[in-house]
Amino acid sequence: MACLGFQRHKAQLNLATRTWPCTLLFFLLFIPVFCKAMHVAQPAVVLASSRGIASFVCEYASPGKATEVRVTVLRQADSQVTEVCAATYMMGNELTFLDDSICTGTSSGNQVNLTIQGLRAMDTGLYICKVELMYPPPYYLGIGNGTQIYVIDPEPCPDSDFLLWILAAVSSGLFFYSFLLTAVSLSKMLKKRSPLTTGVYVKMPPTEPECEKQFQPYFIPIN
């Protein structure tokens, strides 16, 4: 019985091995029928703001009138590709991402305006826009060439306490300098006045007034 079970398992493996090339050939032949390529354009380079916000536009050439669209933002760093955010929306409705997503966006016709927030220098990389026209059939898929987003971390602001200490030290230095300058000036003024005064008061006798000159008045007769 064990030998019979082993033979059945071996036969199933052989059957799966034989049908695998047929399955692969089926997908290669019929996937292009259900999935059609679509051109997606996006800017080549974007510089994030000092607050870590980067915005760019994804524009796709829609061959038909799609009513359901899915937008996905992929990040490629070195050889790794990770999904940043994704959203599915109906044409004419607002583009809404998840509440915890770092992405926001709006749609207008065949354009999707994307904004990525909370970026840091370590998030610098190639951000690829992937657009899928989900409904109605046929299914269209378009992948852009990517937007290189550069993020520069702002320089940290100096500590406010440290600035207060510097201000206090400068103020103290200026006060001490002004006090020293005033003391030196007063000392020089006192040294200049010391030779003029002995510091002893002597009562001097009053001087006799000069004799007043006697003038004889005279009259001029008038005829």
From Swiss-Prot:
A biological-process GO annotation: DNA damage response
Phosphotyrosine PTM positions: Y201
Region (Homodimerization) location: 46-50, 150-155
SMART domains associated with the record: IG, IGv
Segments on the Cytoplasmic side according to the record's topology features: 183-223
Stretches that traverse the bilayer: 162-182
Domain Ig-like V-type: 39-140
Entry-linked CDD domains: IgV_CTLA-4 (cd05721)
Keyword Chaperone carried by entry: no
InterPro entries registered for this protein in UniProt: CTLA4 (IPR008096), CTLA4/CD28 (IPR040216), Ig-like_dom_sf (IPR036179), Ig-like_fold (IPR013783), Ig_sub (IPR003599), Ig_V-set (IPR013106)
Pfam families associated with the record: V-set (PF07686)
Glycosylation site positions: N113, N145
Extra remark: The therapeutic antibody Ipilimumab competes for the binding site of the endogenous ligands CD80/B7-1, CD86/B7-2 and ICOSLG.
Clinical condition linked: Systemic lupus erythematosus: A chronic, relapsing, inflammatory, and often febrile multisystemic disorder of connective tissue, characterized principally by involvement of the skin, joints, kidneys and serosal membranes. It is of unknown etiology, but is thought to represent a failure of the regulatory mechanisms of the autoimmune system. The disease is marked by a wide range of system dysfunctions, an elevated erythrocyte sedimentation rate, and the formation of LE cells in the blood or bone marrow. Genetic variations in CTLA4 may influence susceptibility to Graves disease, an autoimmune disorder associated with overactivity of the thyroid gland and hyperthyroidism.
The protein's name: Cytotoxic T-lymphocyte protein 4
Source organism of this protein record: Homo sapiens (Human)
Gene encoding the protein: CTLA4
